[in-house]
Amino acid sequence: MNGLVFDIAHMLAGGLVLVSMMMLYQDRLYALLNVFALHSLVLTLSVAWQAFVQDAPHLYVTAAIALVFKAIIIPVALHRMIRQLGIHREIETVVGIGPTMLAGIGLVALAMVVMLRVTPEANPLAREDLAFALSVLLLGLLVMITRRNAVSQVVGFMPLENGLVLAATGAKGMPLVVEISVAFSILIAFIVIGVFLFRIRERFDTVDVRALDDFKGRRRK
């Protein structure tokens, strides 16, 4: 039974890393949003499984929060925002997909080596989850760094919190009040970012961050 528990937890956490890798090669905003929704769904399953393994009922609520807000509400709202803004659907990247994927593989390997070496005495399941969580965090940062479009950078930010939740639940859960506060903080940040994107669109007729850099350069002159 313990082997089965470990295998399922390992599969779900590894699936989260795999979906994070999928985000790296998406070249259209709608596809990126759909992959983020899948990312949050896999997180929901992982947290729910940890709730079962640890006999921690509050983690079921955490899983429900991830499902409702991250897998449904936020992706749907961003889909509507893209339509209303008339944003260009294709994503411009700083570097090509090939180098980005290679960098992603390198970051995953780095996360595994670092985390497994610094937690030799930890529970094997917790060690794996922490290593996978660090991989998700690093891949989310890579998505943000390699995208020019502000919306795609916002989507790259969202998996960072998913990685934090995976780490916390793998390390014997987290207080429900913390997860609720994090969820509401993300929603508030999402609303602010939405308003900000509308203002960018009104002012510059684009949400490409290069337009902001050009504007700042002109002001300095």
Per-region residue spans from a language model:
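Alpha-helical transmembrane segments of multi-pass membrane proteins predominantly involved
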Residues: 1-221
